[in-house]
Amino acid sequence: MIEENNTQSRKNDYYIVEDEKGEKFLLPYYAETFRVLMDDKDTIRDVLNSVLGLDRDHEIIDLDYEFEKPIDVFMPEDDPVRLDVWVSTRDKRYFNIEMQNWSHSFFYDRIWLYNAYQTLRGKYEYNRSPYFKSLGKEERKYRFYELPETVSIWFCNFRILNSEKIFKDTWAVYSEDEVSRSSGKEPARPLVTKNRYIIVDLPNFVQLRKSIGSREDFWLKLLSQGPLNVPESEDPVFAGARNRLRVSRMNPDLFKALEDKMFDEKHVREAIEAEAYLKGEAAGKAAGEANERSRNEAANAARDKKIAEYLRSIGVSAEGVSTALAIK
């Protein structure tokens, strides 16, 4: 029993921290603990409004959300990937919020893939919304190709931005010509503002922001460093978020179910393992080919030596020997 408890304690160390009073908290940057943190409309709304920097005229008022939204279009082996948090708002905006701990060779492809699905899904839901259905026939024809606003937000617990001077960047579609002609005074503008990616580099945030000066700072510090590194607050949204991460408030059965899926990033893990295997296989093949070349070169050198010795023994000049060896 002692050995079992020690094993459990070591396992818990990965995603549980304990304060000086002995209170245990979940670290919110794992797959399941992130959902525990985000399982609240007010939290999602506040995270989105602060990270996107939305003013009162554009802030999100009401929303619905769904965890592990499946990408229900064809994927290899019919094995769907899932969006961490899918959010739709009352004013017909669609967001995907991802918490990621691992990079891999096709991480950028993954970002584009998720956004492509998000765009299609957003259009699908937009066309079936009460708003769109309430439009007149000609208005619906006019808006046949209209896309709603779709934003992908990626919280990356690894370095992803090229610059170490920023922790957040917006990616969008730009014209190469406009980018080439842009300057500091007249920067290039995205061709499409409805569809964009917000990339948050949490390691950069930790280096750049040592204290909390905004609501965005609170959320990013909580996500990157955990609940022990943010102050207790009387703000109901902040207090509620921190409280949801208390281990003591969780039902034991729910906690066990959560624990079983804590590291369930199947596709990411498999991609990283497969990449390592393929690189090892390629390195082994290259080493084998190098050894084969080395053996062939040694055999050729030994053969040339014997030919040269024979030619010299029958009186062929040094120039003639060189000419003969060159003819192969």
Q: What are these regions, as identified by a protein language model?
A:
Residues M1-R196, V206, H267, E275, ...:
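Accessory alpha/beta interaction modules
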Residues I2-F25, W86, F95-Q100, N204, ...:
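Short, charged alpha-helical interaction segments and adjacent helix-coil junctions
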